[in-house]
Amino acid sequence: MIKLDVLRLLEEQGKTKYWLYKQLGMSYQNFSKMINNETKSIRYENIETICLLLNCTPNDLFLITDE
């Protein structure tokens, strides 16, 4: 299973979920689902924006697990 690992990146950079939520400008419901890996898809636009905000690559954003 592929999971979004953005919480680790935020922690490493000393940033909060609230900071990212405000930067993305999306609804809190959609943001919460995305952050908590409760969504089936993520728009490329959001992946790109997160990468730019956190100065990372898409490879840094995702984690592959055995679940």
Predicted regions and their residues:
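Short C-terminal boundary/hinge segments that cap the last helix of small helical domains
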Residues: 55-67
